[in-house]
């Protein structure tokens, strides 16, 4: 399912004019900027326009970084060059850019260690980014890349609630997107900033058919405390995942 088809089409037309290897000077420019609020800029990226409505696992970061944005545009160019439709381009960029790079490796490692494969009946969380991609929906609280003076936004300075435009995305667009997922699905927010938004939405009863996993560290290499955080929260994460699996099993039995 494509969310913002008109926007996707508009920016797909600009891809043809980009060089093959992209830098910030190519993408963090006026033609790709959606919003400017003081020093905060939001730029378009095509990889969060596709929603996997049938996902049983939803992983949400705070916002795509430049690395993911770069991968998305380079993948979009290749997809269009191969004659792909807008829909195919949206899927291709989602698969390639969603938590790409070393962050994906760190994410898979932690998911495997906290028992997610056993709960979902799969060999490894790595399969979710490969042959079992139909089980996974990746997204961000702020779906488009956010930069502060061209540096990746981390969820703080400003806090989401202190920014009108970030609040609109986090508490408006984000829950609207997630409520397209039919569920039941496990929602894993990455890091405290994303988790705080998800907890607020749950308290407001703004999310349907989703159960939130609390305490999962952000897998970015920039988070030097992630291993310590994960070790501290590992048992709690394992319990929450087992509880979700049991709840899903109960719901399935009840429908029989």
From Swiss-Prot:
Domain of life, per lineage: Bacteria
Name recorded for this polypeptide: Uncharacterized protein YoxB
Protein species of origin: Bacillus subtilis (strain 168)
Gene responsible for this protein: yoxB
């Amino acid at each position: 399912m494509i969310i913002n088809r008109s926007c996707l089409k508009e920016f797909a037309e600009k891809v043809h004019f980009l060089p093959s290897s992209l830098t910030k000077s190519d993408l963090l420019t006026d033609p790709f900027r959606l919003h400017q609020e003081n020093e905060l800029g939001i730029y378009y990226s095509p990889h969060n326009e596709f929603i996997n409505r049938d996902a049983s696992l939803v992983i949400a970061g705070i916002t795509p970084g430049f690395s993911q944005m770069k991968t998305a545009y380079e993948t979009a160019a290749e997809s269009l060059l191969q004659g792909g439709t807008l829909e195919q381009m949206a899927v291709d960029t989602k698969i390639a850019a969603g938590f790409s790079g070393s962050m994906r490796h760190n994410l898979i490692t932690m998911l495997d260690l906290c028992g997610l494969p056993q709960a979902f009946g799969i060999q490894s969380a790595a399969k979710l980014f490969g042959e079992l991609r139909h089980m996974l929906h990746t997204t961000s609280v702020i779906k488009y890349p956010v930069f502060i003076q061209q540096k990746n936004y981390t969820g703080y300075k400003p806090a989401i609630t202190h920014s009108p435009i970030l609040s609109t995305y986090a508490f408006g667009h984000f829950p609207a997107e997630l409520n397209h997922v039919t569920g039941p699905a496990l929602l894993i927010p990455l890091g405290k900033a994303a988790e705080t938004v998800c907890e607020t939405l749950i308290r407001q009863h703004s999310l349907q058919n989703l159960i939130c996993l609390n305490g999962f560290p952000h897998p970015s290499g920039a988070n030097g405390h992630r291993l310590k955080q994960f070790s501290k929260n590992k048992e709690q994460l394992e319990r929450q995942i087992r509880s979700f699996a049991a709840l899903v099993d109960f719901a399935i039995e009840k429908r029989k």
